[in-house]
C-alpha cells in the first residue's frame, strides 16, 4: 500500500496562508442571526444564565436518497435505521408539547455527535452551553456513525442519502414523530440546520432539495477553492483506502494527521478527547462528496432562507481564503447572508481556545 505523506498543520496550510482578524464572535453571530431572521427571537431567551437539560432522542428513518445529489458508489439500501442523539435546551423551552425553534447540528469527516456536545473537557459541550443561553439544539450521530444505525456496507449510503435522512428528521421534529423515552415529544415550529465540514454540504443539499428549513448555517465548508491537500486526501481515501476496506468504512486521514492538521489554538485535552472518539466514515460519503459539488452550484441559488457562513480565520486546510469568501455568492437566491471569520480558530472552530465565544452574549 502506498503511504500518503502526513502533513503538519502549517504544511497543510502552505506558506501563503493569510491572517485576518475578525472581532465578531460566534455567539454574537448567532445574535445577529436572530435579528436577521436566521434564528427566531421567540426561540431564544436573552443571555442570562439558565439551567440546561439533555434528553435522549431516537428517530426511525429510511436510508433512501430522493435528493438530486446521487450516490457514487452504489444505491442507498432503503432499509430502516435508528438515528440517536440528544435534544438540549432550557427546561422551560422543553416543558410543553410545542416549542418555537430547534437547531439541528450535523458534523463532518471522522466526527460524531461529540462534534457539538463534547464531554469531559469543561467549556466545549456546545449544545449544553448554548442551552444555558436559551437555545434548543438537536445533536446526533448520523447514519453510519457512533450510536446510530450502520448499513452493513458503508458504500450503501451517501451525502444525498444523509440529506434525505435529515429531511425525514426535520419533518418528524415538526410533527413530534420521534421517541423521547422519559417525556412526551415536542413539535417545533421552526427548524434551523447547521453543518460542519462535509456536514455543511449535507445541510446545503437538504436545503435546496426539500426547502423545509428556516435558516442554514455552514461552518468550515465552501463549495470551491479546494486545496491540493484536501484534493489528494479525498482521492486517496476514495480510490485506495475505501477500495481496500472490506466493510466500506474508512478513516479519511491518519491518527497523526487528525491530532495536528484540523486543530489550531486547541487545548491538548480536547485533542486527546476527540481523538479517542474519532469515527470511521461510510465510504459512500467519502466517494460522493466531490460529485455533490455539481448540484450544489446548480441548485444552491434555490435556497431562499437566510444563510450564515462561518470559518476559523486560521483554517485554510480544505479551502482557500478566496474560496471561503466566494461562498456567499453560491447562495444568490438568499435575501440575507453573512460570512464571518472567527479569530484564532482553525477547522474545528468549536474546539479552538476561542470556543468560549460561542456562548458569550
What are these regions (language model features)?
Residues 181-197:
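Alpha/beta-hydrolase fold nucleophile elbow
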Residues 156-185:
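Alpha/beta-hydrolase active-site loop
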Residues 50-98:
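N-terminal cap/lid segment of alpha/beta-hydrolase-fold proteins
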Residues 345-355:
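Catalytic histidine-centered segment of alpha/beta-hydrolase-like enzymes
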Residues 94-135:
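Short, surface-exposed "cap/lid" segments of acyl-processing enzymes
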Residues 303, 309-311, 315:
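Short beta-strand/loop motif that positions the catalytic acidic residue
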Residues 316-325:
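Conserved alpha/beta-hydrolase "acid-adjacent" motif
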Residues 219-299:
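Accessory cap/linker subdomain of secreted extracellular hydrolases
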